[in-house]
Amino acid sequence: LRTGFLDYAAKAYREQLRQDVWPFERFLAATVALGFLLEAGWLLLTLAFPDYIGDPLVVLLGFALILLLVAYFFMLPYLAYSEKGATIDKEMHLFITRMGVLAASEASRKEMFGILAGMREYGTLAKEIDKIFTLVSKWNVGLEKACRTVASQTPSELFSNFLLRLSHAVETGETAEEFFEKEQTVIMDQYEIRYDSAMRSVEIIKEVFVVLVVLVLMIMVLVTFMPFLVMESMGPWIAVTGGFMITLDLLIIYVLEAVVPGERIWHNMKMKTIVQKKITRKFQYSIVMCFIVTGIMIAIWPYLNYYLDLAIKQALFQPASVELQHPTYYIIPLLILSVGLTPLLWPGGYVMDQEADIKRRDGQYPAFIRSLGGSVGSRSKSFTLPLKKLRMHDFGPLKKNIDDLYKRLSVRIKTERAWEYFAAETQSELISKFNEMYVEGSKTGDTKKISKIISDNFIRINGMREQKYESGSNFLWMAYGVAITMSFLLFFGLYIVEQFMILFKDMSIPTEAVQQTGLFFFSFKESMASLPVLWTTSWVIIVIHCALSALMVKSITGGHRMSSAVHFVGMLWASTISAFVVMYAAQFLVV
């Protein structure tokens, strides 16, 4: 394993430098800029906390950051090379499907590579294919030798093995159709293994995330009790712990983006559909409503605070003249933000409904394309007559799209344009990509074979996606639990601090007695930050964490940005309710 890693690392440095794709000047400039930022941060820390800068632990931490920066600089070629390999692997299922379709349409191997080399949507994979096409067409290198040459240089092991098998098939005289028909199963099996491995990694990341969050929450609870143990203000420590929590969230998002298979639910075609225009319009209206609702909530803030306090007093059977030990105005801003952002549920809910329809269309598409391929193959190359019969069948949410496709073709709209409208209006990324392959291959090839290749691979990929949806659903409930727990622990800890402040605010203990007994909590009110600042810091941490948790769910499921807004608002409301429960329970305990 160690030898394999070292060999891959050596190959990464060699290929990056040979191809001149390691932009040394850019990386050096970025490193210098980051060094200046660290130096500026160090100076600010020196000015803000001069007593701590000379501490050996702080100095050691500074040197560790510098060493980490240097290590990152030298690791950049390896990281860039590995990222290219991962990008190629993520496109292999689409690549092999398209190759199978082109082979069924009786295109030569050279023509197939020429077509794929021009498809920039494949990114790094298209560049690797373009190398083969250039070697064959411009340098007159044999296809088998060109495949071996690129296989020795490509960062993807999956693609390298495929090229070696292709080279052997060319040498033995195996036809392109036979080879790519067998490769459908081989590549899809390997892709599925890697997909399952990635999803298992996601489960591990989720477990690590929960463990780290629990650890940070425990630290937050301990920090709230710091004034009772040492003569230190807990304000900076809560801010540092909250910053660590936010950094942890960002790191988890980065890791998920790198590990989770990169398919999206929604397509990214240039054509704007009615649904996309509705989403944009609803979002714009909801933003205006957010400002209006927030303005109203701020205007009624004093009345809101009064009536909430009154409601709690009535629930505790206390007269209105009794002063609450824990007034509600500390957490009113969190309530205002929750109410103010609630209008985002309107476009977000619409997006989630559309995503449910997209998933149902994805489930019906393989049956539709297989039926269409058989009908077209047995009649003619025209889609109109087969679609006329197929539109009578119930394909769920896909039925309307089939009807619209038939109507466009029947009025002599260009075939490619009609199918493009069909793919765009389904909103599905999978359908848009596989649909393009079907239309391209059906012009000259056997539509029955092509539809079988597409439907079989589509079913397998759609089945893999179900793992993502299930994992995202599980993580969503986990994120809600973390948000509720964080809100409860933070506000409960601050409530206890507040009660001790009230208890000891009139006490006067000599400093000598405090130092002799070690009871620093008698003087903590002089050393700690003001409570309003601590409350504000706490709910800011909660809001940022809820937003980042919603983005984590999006990273796993591949959904729309507006669907993450629904989860953000939901977690924000859950945190707000948790805060009010703490307040109510605290008043009950005091009474």
Please tell me what each predicted stretch does.
Residues 25-46, 63-71, 193-255, 289-300, ...:
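Bilayer-spanning, highly hydrophobic alpha-helical transmembrane segments
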Residues 126-127, 157, 161, 212-220, ...:
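Hydrophobic alpha-helical transmembrane segments in multi-pass membrane proteins
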